[in-house]
Amino acid sequence: MTEKHLSSQFDSELNGVSSRVMELGGMVESQIHTAVYALLQFDPEAADRVMETENRVNAMEIDIDRELSSIIARRQPTARDLRLLIAISKTTANLERVGDEANKIARMVKSIIESGSARALPSNELRIAADLASGLLRTALDAFARLDTAAALSILKDDDLIDKEFDGFVRKLVTYMMEDPRTISASLDLLFLAKAIERIGDHAKNIAEFIIYIVKGADVRHTSMQEIESALK
């Protein structure tokens, strides 16, 4: 993931912590897939599996942060390496938050099932947005492993697709509630789920921004697409 250093031990430490981040990413990806399955099938057992993973995700985030703090204290990294370590820490935090969103989905699925209105809701309408969010996270993790700024730029552009899907779903859900007011409570739960999916895409976008920060040293948060493309030249 990184260029070679004079200290092979430093290289080993950087690669080790980067591998842990990818392991965390894989764990969180699995949470998302299971949470979406639980949503589409209204499967309470799948929702339970998502929630059972939460403690492992949280523990791994803490372990990675401890290792990063130790590396910084012992190695006194150069500017580029410090950017990498900071970005790894922020990426880890974003992955943990993706896990939080997966858990929110799982808990809400359980609530909807218990309300007895599960099958009456158009949950399948969320499939496209969920697939987009999951795909963006996978691309972000792959780009992070390769420090691929071109892939990072593609993620930043594609994030708008999830936002459009979310907006379209909200319009459909409002219409659905107006046609059948009895489903308002459960429909609001589904709206909460849609927002959780949108946030997963936002976290993938954040990771893409960290990649650009590592490679180019440019903080592209809250900047226009034109400014981002200029920073990558």
Predicted region positions:
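Cytosolic, long alpha-helical scaffolding segments
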Residues: M1-K233
